[in-house]
Amino acid sequence: MPIRTFIFDFDGTILDTESQDFVVVDEMWKAHDQVLELTEWRTGLGTTGGFNAYDALEARLGRSIDRAHWKAHNHQRLLEHCSTQPIRPGVHALFDYAIAHGITLTVGSSGNREWVHRWLHEHGIFHLFATIVTSNDVSAVKPSPEIFLTVAANVAAHPADCLVFEDSAHGVTAANRAGMRSVAVPIPSLVDAWMPDSALRLRTLADITPAELVARAAAAPLPSATA
C-alpha cells in the first residue's frame, strides 16, 4: 500500500531540541553539585509525566530549590541553545520528496502548540504542513496513539497509508498502537536505547535516499493497532 502521509514528530526528529534540554538541565544539576545520569533523563522523552528534573533534583538534595528562578533561567537558556540548532539531517530532503510525490506533510508532537509553532516558523517550514497536532489538541500524549490518529483524521488519511518519523520509544509505541508504520531515528543520546519494533531504524534520515526509505518502509509489515 503506498505511503500517502508523512507524520513527523517535532522535538528530536525535525529539530534536536532534546539534546539541548539535557545540556540546560545538566547545568542546573551541576550548579547544585549533583550529577544527572543520561539514562535517567531520557526516560521522559517523547511524553509528559515522565522524568521531572526539578522533582528529581529536590529528592536528591532533600530540600526545595527556587523553582520559579530555575524554570525561568532554564527556559531562556533552552531558547538560546535551540536557536543555534539546524534542522536534522535528511529532513529537508524528505520534505522535498513528499512535495514532489504528492505526499501530505504533517506534524504530530507531544510538545505544546506555542513551542512547536515557534520553531516551525523560525525555520520557515510551518507552511509545509497540512495539519499540526500537539498536546493542546488531545487528551493523551504519546505513547497513546491519539496524536497520530488525530493527525490522520484531520487529513482524511487511513493509518495504513501513514509513515511516522520518530526519535523516541514513546513515539514509536504510539505509532504502533495507531496501526502506522514508523521510522525510528534516535538523537545521539538515544542511539543505544531500546526501541520498539519499527519499519526502519536509522542513525539519521540522510542515511538512505528518500525513495529507498519510503520503499523499504512501505514493504514492512503493518503494526496491529491497539488504540
Show which residues each predicted segment covers.
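Short, flexible loop segments at the rims of nucleotide/cofactor-binding pockets, characterized by
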Residues: 82-86, 110, 178-179
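Residue-level detector of anion-binding/catalytic polar loops
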Residues: 35, 104, 181
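Surface-exposed, interaction-prone regions with an acidic/low-complexity signature
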Residues: 11-12, 101-104, 123, 132
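Residue-level marker of regulatory loop/turn positions in helix-turn-helix DNA-binding domains and
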Residues: 87, 108, 140
